[in-house]
Amino acid sequence: MRHYEIVFLVHPDQSEQVPGMIERYTSAVKDSGGSVHRLEDWGRRQMAYSINKIHKAHYVLMNIECGDQALEELTTNFRYNDAILRNMVIRCDEAVTEESPIQKAEKENRERKNRAERRAAEAAAATETEKSESEESAEEETSTDTTGEEE
């Protein structure tokens, strides 16, 4: 069996059907005795150029190991499925299981946003604490002033 990297683009109006498509294609590979080494759903993204006046598509990446029959079945399914705008199949020398650069970049961006949100929340909490402490000290000063006048 050989290793393949497959990327296919799904019409944006059919995005809700992507999990079903992925399940169908992975089961076709597994039923033929192959295996899926990596599966990444990149989501809806801007395309480099428009296809049939469509500017966005749902991207899916699969790294599989399968025989010729299973690959032929997959490419036939891609060809006759109107929801698939483009597909690309590349033969690889070995199985690729690590995250793709796109997935890594998205993960880093999410982590950066989370860190920035945490910092902002901590800063807001710190300023809130300072305000409450200054209000408490101001109240204490006014209460001591009023008690001093009564005596």
UniProtKB/Swiss-Prot annotation:
Keywords: Ribonucleoprotein, Ribosomal protein, RNA-binding, rRNA-binding. GO terms for cellular component: cytosolic small ribosomal subunit. It holds the Pfam family Ribosomal_S6. Residues 98-151 are annotated as: Disordered. Residues 135-151 have a biased composition (Acidic residues). GO terms for molecular function: small ribosomal subunit rRNA binding; structural constituent of ribosome. The keyword Cell cycle does not apply. One of its GO terms (biological process) is translation. InterPro entries: Ribosomal_bS6, Ribosomal_bS6_sf, Ribosomal_S6_plastid/chlpt, Transl_elong_EF1B/ribsomal_bS6. Belongs to the bacterial ribosomal protein bS6 family. Binds together with bS18 to 16S ribosomal RNA. This is Small ribosomal subunit protein bS6. It comes from Teredinibacter turnerae (strain ATCC 39867 / T7901).
